[in-house]
Amino acid sequence: AIYKGCMLDCLKGRSVSRPTWSNRDIGREAMKISVRLLDFLGENGRKTVLPMLKEWIEEDKGFLDSLKNVEDIDIKDRAKKLLSDTSVRSEVPSVHKLYPLMDRVIHRRKKYLFAVSMYSERIQNTEIMNHENRFGWHQNNGMTYIYDADNQYTENYWNTVNPFRLSGTTVVPVNIGNGKPDSSGYVQGGDFCSKESWVGGTGIENFGISGMAFSGKVQTVSGDPAVSYAPDLKGKKSWFMFEKEIVCLGAGITNKNMEIPVETIIENKKLRKDGSNQFLINGESPDVLLRKADVKELVKRSKDMSGTRFEQVHWAHLEGNRSVGTGYYFPEENTEIQVCR
């Protein structure tokens, strides 16, 4: 649930939209609680928790400085003692973990963490409540997360990202809406369960596969549709997770109503402030369209967000902000993609 001291965003529900409650903030709260609970752990529990806790504290350089309140004095002292304890080796082990009761999968390695958030007949597409996370309609639509040295999801990522183009998702980019405000004065709508049960996965040791059937048909509430989306959209997505490779597959993706085309989003990453990240396609650095729009303009579809079209794409690579970046391989010879900044 934590990577380098940050709580995973796929586990945060609607709180991802709170700019003052980032994954770093929640991660620090979790670390503080972990320090408090150390005395209640048995020997086996301490052997498991101490190495991970030590690495989280080492990776979050601002954790100790954030402990400023009177009630944090003891926590800070214990954290310092843990850092100086040479008998504890900082280590977060590789793991492949399925969470079937919330349709999540986490694939953790030393230098990265990959996660997928899905939805089904059991789990909703997102959490929208009390006017929070109003545009989070596709956050569980097979969204893929890559955590590495770039800290992608901090610094108000969720309130600035294109809500129709979240990494790994296959969607019809339409404004689903949030319904009318209730007696509280806040909107509560836009989240729903699908009618699909083929959602889940399995694993062998530290490797695994997951799959998700999806469609625009949603479950009804009190006999009425929860939301008007794209009833003709359907398909299946699968993810095969190995050591350094993640294989992402899509099959049977169709939508009879093509007024607004279906989009599959390969990646959507936050760049450096100057946008200087190198992007390569088949070994060349092409010119790519620069698009500017705020989230409200994106939701209204009032701005042209089409990208530069590339054909016969075999591979691509995007340089990271701090990391070496991520490579993408396309096995089919006729692959065509669109790219914009």
Language model regions located:
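Extended polysaccharide-engagement surfaces of secreted carbohydrate-active enzymes
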Residues: 3-341
